[in-house]
Amino acid sequence: MPKLGMQPIRRRQLIQATLETIDDVGLADATIARIAKRAGVSAGIISHYFGGKDGLLESAMRQILWDLGDAVARRRAQGVESPREHIRAIIDGNFDRSQVNKTVMKTWLAFWSVSMHRPDLQRLQRVNDRWLYSNLCHHFRRCLPRPEAQQAARGLAAMIDGLWLRGALAPQGIDVDRARQLAYDYVEEQLARSTSHAPTDA
């Protein structure tokens, strides 16, 4: 986490420079010097506030995850009420422009790779995974018995990640509309079971 005292606008500037540098040259070659040059600051500023490239990557990912949460919250704020609407808001947030632009997608891929060797980044990834699963499970649980709600949530979380990953690796980029529709179709298949099953407890 960056130290206190940095102005939010400067912090965002450095994070954006990090994302763009990773996009241009990859994580391995995204040196502090390159990031600092792109941001128009000294390398010492980055080292002082972030402790180096690893700290800057962690802060960049925290910002991306904050943007993801905000994308979901904005959709929920539009008056969604039913389980279907809440689940769709989560799907839409995960395929929001803030999560599917080329620069952010490359940073996500770099983060996943590095997090396998960094316990602190692994924790950040687990927090995100748990947030997605628990939110999906909560709303499926409003329609389905617990075991089926849990299974539906696991399946949809895996589908969201899989659709996102295939899109990130596709030469032509991600087809957001198609990805969303595939996820919507899965939700409808799961919710169709609610006509013959009711939740067993709150």
Swiss-Prot record:
Superkingdom field: Bacteria
HTH tetR-type domain residues: 8-68
Record-linked Gene3D superfamilies: Tetracycline Repressor, domain 2 (1.10.357.10)
Feature: DNA-binding region: 31-50
Biological process annotations from GO: glycine betaine biosynthetic process from choline; negative regulation of DNA-templated transcription
Classification via Pfam families: TetR_C_6 (PF13977), TetR_N (PF00440)
One Gene Ontology MF term: DNA-binding transcription factor activity
SUPFAM superfamilies on file: Homeodomain-like, Tetracyclin repressor-like, C-terminal domain
InterPro entries: BetI_C, DNA-bd_HTH_TetR-type_CS, Homeodomain-like_sf, HTH-type_TetR-like_transc_reg, HTH_TetR, Tet_transcr_reg_TetR-rel_C_sf, Tscrpt_rep_BetI
Annotated S-S bridges: none
Keywords per UniProt: DNA-binding, Repressor, Transcription, Transcription regulation
Pathway stated in the Swiss-Prot or TrEMBL entry: Amine and polyamine biosynthesis; betaine biosynthesis via choline pathway [regulation]
Classification via HAMAP family: HTH_type_BetI
Role this protein plays: Repressor involved in the biosynthesis of the osmoprotectant glycine betaine. It represses transcription of the choline transporter BetT and the genes of BetAB involved in the synthesis of glycine betaine.
Entry-linked NCBIfam families: betaine_BetI, PRK00767.1
Name of protein: HTH-type transcriptional regulator BetI 1
Source organism of the structure: Chromohalobacter salexigens (strain ATCC BAA-138 / DSM 3043 / CIP 106854 / NCIMB 13768 / 1H11)
Primary gene name: betI1
